[in-house]
A protein has these predicted regions:
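Acidic, two-metal ion nucleic-acid-processing modules in DNA metabolism proteins
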Residues: 21, 40, 112, 117, ...
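Short amphipathic alpha-helical segments and helix-helix/interface helices
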Residues: 80, 137, 161-162, 660
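Conserved nucleotide-binding/hydrolysis micro-motifs of P-loop NTPases
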Residues: 98, 126, 155, 177-179, ...
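Short alpha-helices
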Residues: 106, 183-223, 227-239, 618-619
């Protein structure tokens, strides 16, 4: 089935319901073989020895590496000690995202607790952008600190670091990003990715490096300090930045979750309790709670251009201040969501209204009024909704268009932007996501260059990604005991993903739309007579394909659904498709259709149906709605199923493909057969003055008529 639900929770993104994807399992368990879920999970995590299993299951404070393994840690601590003894001022230069904010807050908390004068500066995302910048450096030099410490930035700012040091400001860089060709030369440089760095783990977040710095300073200045509040910040920033939950990151995040209620900084605890009251009763939050509840609210501060509430929340010990900051963050997040919804809706309306835009391979939209802080989210939504790359631009006060780009399929969006580099002020990113700035006067030339680049065959935009599950889960293992085993592998996250299982041959007992039609709730029957509920977020379109009684396969996570102190096992659906027998019949009909195209007469084929001319108008109306909604590519078997549920008659794949051929021959659509076996169709711009095409004049109609493939002909 064609629902690739990229994320695991409420931010699930709707993808084309009429597209088939290849399902694969990472581990193949032979039928009759002893099924051991714990062993399967251990194998998938590369846990082969008893020692590896012990380290994985019991990751704790003792799993953390010595911070003094960093090449420059001794020097960095000594520099701070000099400033401390001299009573000098320290300035922490951070970043506006959750990793940068938690890094900044962590060092501020340490310095304030140690009696060291420290202040913080966070660049404004909307005005300054990421990291050290010329304007910020000039401002800093007007009131210079004795020591500047960067967190979560600085590795790509060699010239600006040199400028600060020439002005007499000592600089310590703490960062985790890959370095540019020119390595900065501060007095001390803490970055696990630095060339020649001996620190044993390269996967720390920016806040992980800040934590190591604080722990090293605490060891020298105040060894009795409790590090758990810092670890709560480090855990949140590590999850927010999608760092691998391996090695000491696993220990950091586990500690941060286990001791969240007892030891998290007051602002985080209060915000967490307001969003998840069960925390007050001792329930531990999970990484999903961090990712989908706390992180978006902290990131909203940066997106909206005002990080003060976020930094206050993370640094204050006053509950009144923390509650006020949490309320301000909630307001910012609501505004972020409102802007995102409004801009998305406006963008979709423009695409539907503008025929050329709907037909192009690449979406490029600009509006100087669109808020710069949400453009990346909007571009991602449009890319998935219309299944093509998307670039979305807003304007700034300097007369520039600043945009975010998201790719689709195998298309290299950074290479596309580079094709118009002569018109860009700057750009960067990677093949899947990028950012770009263009002067307003050059924007149309830039847009034309991108459209020329994207005038490629549709195959360039096809997604070749398979949908992977850990293994096929037997029905008898769909139970809470299995979930207990899976809980031992927490915390889940990057490089330790929560497992998705393929569960075959389920009975679809009930389905209903919930959440205003946005989500789909199902009841599924297992082969032992038990029933289990399932939810597919942002997947209401699934109701166009399935009915009660269908046999289906699903890709899903096992989850425990808790409400009003009632606990119930539930499936969180990622994909749903027809079971093997139905899919096999579709393939037989597709093969018959292909042989007919190759010249085999209808009488020699099991085509699965004939064409009734009375269905052509209703099929055309049905298809037009699908294409106007931007769905592509299309699986002809799923199109037939959806047409039946939309009120049309039951038709075979062969008939669907003949109807598409006829509409293409009549000039109503353009039709391309894709390498995946699906089709891509586009609506044609119709000339109202042109002569209306006649069905009887089309080659497909004539051949079907001659071979007895048309019924109800007068």
């Amino acid at each position: 089935m064609g629902y690739n639900i990229h994320s695991n929770r409420k931010e699930l993104v709707l993808v084309n319901p009429f597209q088939q994807h290849r399902w694969e399992t990472d581990l193949t368990i032979q039928e009759g073989e002893n099924f051991n879920l714990r062993k399967i999970m251990e194998e998938s995590r590369g846990l082969e020895s008893e020692e590896q299993c012990t380290a994985f299951y019991h990751a704790d404070y003792s799993s953390l590496h010595d911070p003094f393994l960093f090449n420059d840690m001794e020097l960095a601590v000594e520099l701070v000690d000099q400033v401390r003894r001299q009573g000098g001022k320290i300035l922490i230069f951070g970043d506006y995202d959750c990793d940068g904010l938690t890094s900044t807050a962590l060092l501020l908390r340490f310095f304030h607790a140690s009696g060291i004068h420290a202040e913080a500066r966070i660049p404004n995302r909307l005005e300054e952008g990421y990291g050290l910048n010329e304007a910020a450096v000039e401002d800093i030099m007007r009131d210079p600190p004795a020591l500047l410490i960067t967190v979560d930035c600085g590795s790509s700012s060699a010239e600006l670091v040199q400028k600060l040091m020439q002005a007499g400001i000592a600089v310590i860089l703490t960062d985790h990003h890959e370095l540019s060709q020119e390595e900065p030369r501060p007095l001390a440089f803490l970055n696990p990715c630095r060339r020649g760095e001996r620190y044993p783990f390269k996967g720390l977040a920016g806040v992980g490096v800040a934590l190591k710095f604080a722990m090293a300073m605490a060891e020298r200045f105040c060894p009795e300090t409790n590090p758990l509040p810092w670890i709560s910040l480090a855990a949140l920033g590590t999850v927010a930045d999608s760092m691998p939950l391996l090695d000491e990151n696993r220990a950091l995040v586990r500690l941060g979750l286990d001791y969240f209620y007892e030891a998290a900084v007051p602002g985080l605890r209060l915000l967490g309790e307001s969003l998840k009251p069960e925390i007050r009763k001792g329930e531990k939050p999970g990484t999903e709670f961090f990712s989908f509840s706390l992180v978006p609210r902290l990131n909203a501060a940066g997106r909206m251009g005002d990080t003060e509430p976020a930094l206050t929340l993370l640094t204050t010990d006053d509950e009144g201040e923390a509650l006020a900051a949490a309320a301000a963050l909630e307001k910012q997040n609501e505004e972020r969501r409102r802007l995102e919804r409004e801009i998305c809706a406006e963008a979709v309306e423009r695409i539907h209204r503008d025929d050329p835009l709907l037909h192009r391979n690449l979406i490029l939209l600009a509006d100087p009024a669109w808020h710069l802080g949400v453009l990346g989210i909007v571009a991602s939504r449009l890319s998935q909704r219309f299944q093509r790359p998307a670039l979305v631009f807003g304007g700034d006060q300097a007369g520039e268009y600043r945009g975010s780009a998201r790719s689709y399929g195998d298309f290299d969006i950074l290479e596309a932007i580079a094709s118009g580099r002569e018109y860009c002020e700057n750009f960067g990113g990677h093949r899947l996501a990028a950012g770009v700035s263009v002067k307003e006067a050059k924007f149309e030339d830039f847009a034309a260059a991108l459209r020329d680049y994207a005038a490629l065959p549709r195959s360039a935009f096809e997604s070749t990604v398979s949908h992977h599950s850990l293994c096929i889960l037997p029905h008898r293992y769909v139970q809470e005991e299995s979930l207990n085993i899976l809980n031992d592998f927490e915390p889940y996250g990057q490089a330790n993903e929560r497992p998705i299982f393929q569960i075959n041959h389920l009975s679809l007992l009930n389905l209903r739309l919930v959440g205003g039609g946005e989500h789909l709730s199902v009841t599924l029957g297992l082969d032992d007579g038990r029933e289990i509920g399932g939810i597919a977020f942002r997947s209401g379109e699934l109701a166009k394909l399935f009915v009660r009684g269908d046999k289906v396969d699903v890709r899903a996570e096992l989850k425990l659904h808790v409400w009003n102190e009632h606990r119930e096992l539930q499936l969180l659906l990622h994909d749903m498709r027809f079971s093997e027998a139905e899919r096999r019949q579709m393939e037989i009909e597709k093969e018959a259709s292909q042989r007919w195209r190759e010249g085999r007469p209808l009488t020699e084929l099991e085509s699965g149906g004939t064409l009734d001319p009375a269905m052509i108008p209703s099929f055309w109306c049905f298809l037009e709605k699908i294409l106007k909604a931007g769905f592509r590519p299309l699986d002809t078997g799923l199109i037939g199923q959806a047409f039946r549920l939309a009120g049309g008659s039951k038709i075979s794949v062969f008939t669907v493909e003949r109807l598409l051929d006829l509409l293409a021959e009549m000039g109503l659509i353009t039709l391309n057969k894709l390498q995946t076996g699906e089709v891509s169709a586009e609506l044609c711009a119709l000339d109202s003055s042109a002569k209306r095409p006649q069905l009887s004049a089309q080659a497909t109609w004539k051949r079907l008529l001659a071979e007895g493939g048309v019924k109800n002909v007068g």
